[in-house]
């Protein structure tokens, strides 16, 4: 669920933003609001899923089941989106925030094309960030299926 919601931002929302404004200041404002809502909900979902994986891992470890490490790995893969955001995406985020702040003060010297290029780069960094919860989900699913089949 987290991955699908996250991917929809890059593949649906960002193109809609591109197609509905021709003012760089408006595009920056829309991106800022998108980021605001995304940063509230997406990490919370990721932390919740990570917590569930770690809870399952702890339960399996307590019952001496070897599969616990796979659930822990699923949790670790899922939460890796947080350091990725802080390390890899922060420079792009900060550039967009600076441009957005500049646009709030008055007319900006940045062109629509420049803003679109930065947001396009951000959208692809965001797609890469989606890989972490997806991998976590796949590891968790495969672990569950293997355990359910009695292996």
Show where each model-derived region lies.
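Core segments of transmembrane alpha-helices
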Residues: 43-54, 74, 132-137
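A hydrophobic membrane-anchoring alpha-helix module
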Residues: 126-150
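Structural signal for the C-terminal ends of transmembrane alpha-helices
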Residues: 57-62, 145-146
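Hydrophobic alpha-helical membrane-embedded segments
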Residues: 1-11, 78-91
């Amino acid at each position: 669920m987290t991955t699908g919601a996250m991917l929809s931002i890059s593949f649906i929302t960002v193109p809609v933003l591109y197609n509905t404004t021709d003012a760089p200041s408006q595009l920056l404002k829309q991106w800022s609001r998108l980021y605001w809502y995304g940063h509230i909900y997406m990490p919370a979902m990721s932390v919740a899923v990570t917590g569930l994986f770690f809870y399952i891992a702890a339960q399996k470890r307590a019952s001496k089941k070897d599969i616990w490490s796979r659930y822990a790995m699923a949790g670790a893969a899922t939460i890796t989106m947080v350091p990725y955001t802080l390390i890899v995406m922060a420079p792009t985020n900060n550039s967009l925030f600076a441009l957005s702040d500049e646009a709030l003060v008055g007319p900006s010297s940045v062109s629509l094309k420049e803003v679109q290029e930065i947001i396009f780069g951000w959208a692809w960094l965001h797609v890469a960030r989606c890989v972490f919860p997806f991998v976590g989900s796949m590891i968790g699913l495969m672990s569950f299926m293997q355990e359910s089949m009695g292996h």
